[in-house]
């Protein structure tokens, strides 16, 4: 194993980003609107912020963007969860809408996927490498059999990060074979892949490492890229 080293729910009549709280009330959203949007504390319209596009797994109705960003950074990023994280068009709609309303650096857009969403993040980024500055997968498999690194000249310079818990289960999550195959693929293709492997510190060793324990490393990796 290799070791390398408050949100608001969107509404059409949205709150002013100059509001100190950066919070709006939770509402029922039109399908074209992002599911959740996070503005950094002290948002300044004259500064172009990196945009983080979060892709939680499709059955995770409890993903809390605000809590996640509080653990990651309150000031560095704008962040959004698309209305349908499993749909590429929905992802780009969320990006376009956020860029039309807030100050986003068009060359600093990062995909961050969790488990199943991590595979989608790899997929979307490799299919559209010019649209993203980097991609992070948390316990999500790289789609090994889709030829995503076939567009070698376009994809090999795209920074990618894989965060994995050594205790993840097989199935939709990573296992040792997935990790080894992914490392061999990137080595052969000359792709840019940074990996973090997290050791479980629980007493019985069965509980997975939480996303909150990983976001600090993701923040540092992105800021190094910026």
Model-derived features: positions:
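Extracellular/periplasmic catalytic domains that process cell-envelope and extracellular macromolecules
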Residues: 44-47, 71-74, 104, 153-156, ...
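The feature captures the conserved acid-bearing segment of alpha/beta-hydrolase catalytic domains
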Residues: 139-223
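Gly/Ser-rich "nucleophile elbow"/oxyanion-hole loop immediately N-terminal to the catalytic nucleophile
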Residues: 42-47, 87-115, 129
